[in-house]
Every structure is written in C-alpha cells, then in structure tokens.
Amino acid sequence: MIKIEKLTQSYCLNDINCTLPSGKLIGIMGANGAGKSTLLKTISGILPLKQGEIWFDNQPLSKMNSTEKSQHIAYLAQNTQIHWDLSVYDVIALGLATPLPKEKERSKIQTFSEKFAVTHLLDKPFQQLSGGEKARV
C-alpha cells in the first residue's frame, strides 16, 4: 500500500492526500503541467520530499535507504532514449531504482512482467513491440 499525506511539491502539487491499495493498477491523468510526473518522481524518490510524507506498507519514504526504496519502487520515464537494441527484460531492468543481485533482479522482473502481462515479451527486442506493448513495458 502507498499512502500519501499532505504532499506539497513545487508549484503543482498542493496538499495531496490519498491511499493506493497494493496489487492495483492505478492511472494518473491530468493536463500538461498538472504535476503527474512530479508526483511520480516524488513517489519514486527521484525528487526529494519538500512537505508531507509518502508511506510504503507503513514505512516512511523519508526514512528509507536506497536498498529499501528499490524493494518498493521502480521508475522508468515514458519518453526516454531507450536503447532500442535491448530486450524487454533489459529495459525493465534499467527501471530498477538500484542494481540488484542477478537472482533478485530476475525475481523482481518476473513479478512485474506477470503483473503487467508481458512475460511472453521478456526475450523480445524492445524495438519490435507494438505501441500498446511498449506502453505496458
């Protein structure tokens, strides 16, 4: 579960409060400049918290070290300079917050791939995916 309390960040996020249940796929929608990316970057720990707190399973983000964060968070920006020659597996591995030992990496990527129904694509070159498949990855 992710719980956001009184999150204020920059000019675009003001007193955000919500609870996101575990195991659910959540969409964040809004106009350009509404703060979608700022919210995701703050949740993922890329941007430091200015005000408020984010909790992962009752553990505050502000108290987590990078290893603990990597157990809860992965972030891959939508528009990046993806290495087109990489497999889907490798692209997902790039999104991990910190490098993991190979066995833990495999396990985490397997879990993600099952959750987003892309397991059958793991060995496929990223450049060969359809638009919808790329979006899920």
What is the predicted role of each segment?
Residues 29-31:
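The feature captures the beta-strand-to-loop junction immediately N-terminal to the Walker
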